[in-house]
Amino acid sequence: MQSPEIVACAVAASLSVLALGGARQQAPNTRSNWPCGGRVDPSYFQVAEGTGGHLFLLAPFEIADSTPLLLAVDKHPQTIFRLAGSITPGVHEFRIPIDGSVESALFSISVQCLQTAELVRPSGALVTGEGVADYATFRAERMTIVEHPETGTWTVRASGSGIAGVMVQARTDIALVGLEFAPPPGTAFKATPVAGVENVVRLRVRGDVQDVEASIVSGAFKTIARLALTPDEGEHAYVARFSPGAGGFRVAVTGRDPHGLPFQRVSAPLFTPR
């Protein structure tokens, strides 16, 4: 059997893509440095993005120890932050709002040539101690799970280069659900936006929230456009109109929880208009 370059592994409702070094394409010394010295097939990166799956850059010998990562992702179904693409050498910081509804938060950093990865509490202290599970034995992946995280702005700090993904997922009552798209008049809703025309987007935020706003963001989590939300039928249900460009995008919603603290939820899949 040929050694696979990529293995796709389904875990419950989520799809996780494990990127492996391929013997048929890499010299022995290159393979030993996988993934930094290897080549990741971009199609598998696209699969992870298009399905909202989790991209793990793992060396072949790390697969046996990856089960806790896969199970942890499945137990944290709501996405708070997601960025994927390539990063340049140097230190990068990402600020993540954690609201009072978050029972458990999963912070994941995957960088092809990972150098450093840190998670900083709102107080400025590095994350350690009780209620923290840290998976830091992988070459290109760092995952930290924090039970009952304090509210406020957390900071993910990473350095390295190459293909990268920074994802924050949570177990929480506040969720972005029912996200659908339709060309006008907005009656035939589907999971995929229609290219070349104005779309009606329909969404609902589940949970006790207020001051809900929404925006279209890129795969690199850059704001593309603000959505002008109009209340729809149902609690915290909204519709808006926008004309998608050719590139992929996500929908991000923000607002405040019952205590007035800011929350953020993001659609995990990267939508590509068709």
Residue spans for each PLM region:
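C-terminal "exit" segments of structured domains
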Residues: 49-51, 56-141, 146-147, 153-159, ...
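Edge beta-strands of extracellular beta-sandwich domains
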Residues: 164-172, 259-273
